A protein has these predicted regions:
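Short hydrophobic/aromatic-enriched beta-strand-loop microsegments
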Residues: 55-61, 121-126, 163-166
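Short internal alpha-helix immediately C-terminal to a glycine-rich phosphate-binding loop
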Residues: 22-24, 127-135
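Short glycine-rich, basic-tinged beta-strand/loop micro-motifs
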Residues: 28-38
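Short loop/helix-cap segments at secondary-structure boundaries that form the rim of catalytic
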Residues: 113-119, 136
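Catalytic cysteine-centered active loop of the rhodanese-like fold, especially the PTP/DSP P-loop
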Residues: 42, 133-166
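Flexible, polar/low-complexity N-terminal or interdomain linker segments that lie immediately upstream
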Residues: 3-10, 28-30, 53-54, 58-115
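Short, thiol/selenol-centered motifs that function as redox-active sites or metal-ligating centers
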Residues: 12-22, 39-47, 146-152
Length: 166
């Protein structure tokens, strides 16, 4: 068991709420303190790890017990966190993406994709993106989508850091 300074109950919440609550809770911690987030959303595994990395906090890891994910994040220097965070604005509607040339990249979990997706969209769940970027063509325009925009924003940031410019 990992020692934490503060516990956050995000059980029963779906994306983006575990991240929203985590961000708020992290604001109340001092540098070096560890937050334990308890969540039941399977997407939280990839979402919280990616968010932590994006904003400069240390994602320590996740344990699962009886369908509850216990995530552990250590707060790092807030000046670094603010400097790293960057949002990408929506550039096209889902309907527009279907008509355009390029790749529609769906970063939702496989189960979410199975229940409904844009025809022709490529599914690479957020948690697999770093290992599967080689499946994408840097020369093509990539439209990144998810359910709420949170994961697609994080994915767009990861792609930009990896040299994807379209």
């Amino acid at each position: 068991m990992i020692k934490s300074d503060v516990q956050l109950d995000a059980k029963g919440l779906a994306c983006p709420m575990p991240i929203v609550k985590t961000k708020k809770a992290m604001g109340n911690l001092t540098e070096g303190q560890v937050l334990e987030i308890q969540a039941t959303d399977k997407g939280s595994v990839a979402d919280l790890a990616a968010w932590s990395k994006t904003v400069g906090h240390q994602y320590i890891g996740t344990n699962e017990e009886n369908g509850v994910f216990y995530h552990y994040i250590r707060k790092c220097n807030p000046e670094v966190s603010e400097a790293v965070e960057k949002s990408f604005e929506q550039t096209i509607s889902n309907e527009g993406a279907i008509k355009e040339e390029g790749i529609i990249l769906d970063v939702r979990e496989a189960a979410e994709y199975a229940f409904g997706h844009i025809p022709g969209a490529k599914s690479i769940p957020m948690g697999e993106l770093s290992e599967r970027m080689n499946e994408l063509d840097k020369a093509q325009t990539i439209y990144v989508i998810c359910r709420t925009g949170t994961r697609s924003d994080l994915a767009a940031q990861q792609l930009a850091k990896a040299g994807f410019t379209n």
